[in-house]
């Protein structure tokens, strides 16, 4: 068994083999001073107290006390890898972004896959959307396409995002996952129906990270060299084929190998089985957007492929594992506002909210100079601006260059060629209620036409199996929403709930009771 282990299990062995005949490095403190003894503290006598002058101990312990940084408030559990994006089809008619400059061009990328609601130690095989974030290191700075494995989302207004995430996480008193919180929010916000239906379908538990699609999800804007703009959506189609886990296999793996997705990705790359995805775009003109039957910037809906076909762009290939997880994955920070010329945001309310929220949380989690961390640094562009100082400034702080603008001393100048595309909007300023913007039509299509009968059966079973743990009044609200999609959808879920609710609670947990030992009182006293 020990001779037939996978690359992830043998990482330490491989690291030693790579060093070959090299002698071990000299052990040092953080300050580089050689350490004479790493096994024993400096004390007064063998039983005496420690000394403050034991700098080997204080150096080690002080750093250990500060090892952990705040985990991501969402997408805490993840896996990362590196590779390249190669253009295979010309889309310069749509975008002047250098990443799409010519066929055959390669751009380095970093990718992070993740679950959403779980903590950093949670299982990879839970039913949860998957994050699918890609950082393109371009000559015009980083482009971060921060998406999921679904083309839609639970809400369409960013103001609801904190409450939505709170509902998916732990109860503030019990610190337990709470089905009442989850389903109460979903049932009160029927715009979640599309994503909830996707989540509880077979695709709700992907088989690792390699066998799922990715989506930019939001609507973006592409601008070409002539200043002409279109709206677009980004799609990554897995070249490995879609594979999903059954409920039973997912539960088994959550127990036996909670890091299943991370392990699978690492081993695939380590053995040269490089995963890849094909990038496509959908394109919509501004005039088409004006007459579109629904809001084209609504994140709870998709653009029909029959009307807006997928246009191939290129291929993403992952061919390198992280050298160190903390340095290259835990500190990896994606920001939707990182957009080079040729790619811009649309009026999508969720995207607009993320433009602020993502860099803001990175400054909290990693510090104001998080863009100087090597994995986040736009190393293919020359950063020149008027930002200075701050905690953990690791570069030369831009030397003696002026730190104010405008100035008369040959410091960085803005470039009119990088100006955003001019767009006209008009309308009243108010808080518009979008809760009832047709929450059912596309869900009905998904239920009746995308899924077959066996998939519909599993969808209803999965929903009922989770919804049964919520209070009855919440169950009724949720079933009404599913019935609004299609009467059969709601009735099938209700029938399954009725069966669950008729069953008496059973204690399926088997325990071992500790009986009295045969030790004498004297023997117990010596324990």
UniProtKB/Swiss-Prot annotation:
Subcellular location field: Peroxisome matrix
Stretch list, region Disordered: 1-42
Summary of pH dependence: Optimum pH is 7.
Residues annotated with Phosphothreonine modification: 511
One Pfam family per UniProt: Catalase
Motif range (Microbody targeting signal): 524-527
Modified residues (Blocked amino end (Ala)): 2
EC number: 1.11.1.6
Keyword list, A-Z: Acetylation, Heme, Hydrogen peroxide, Iron, Metal-binding, Mitogen, NADP, Oxidoreductase, Peroxidase, Peroxisome, Phosphoprotein
Modified residues annotated as N-acetylalanine in this record: 2
SUPFAM superfamilies: Heme-dependent catalase-like
Sites of Phosphoserine modification: 9, 417, 434, 517
PANTHER family (UniProt xref): CATALASE (PTHR11465:SF9)
Subunit record text: Homotetramer. Interacts (via microbody targeting signal) with PEX5, monomeric form interacts with PEX5, leading to its translocation into peroxisomes.
Name of the protein described by the UniProt record: Catalase
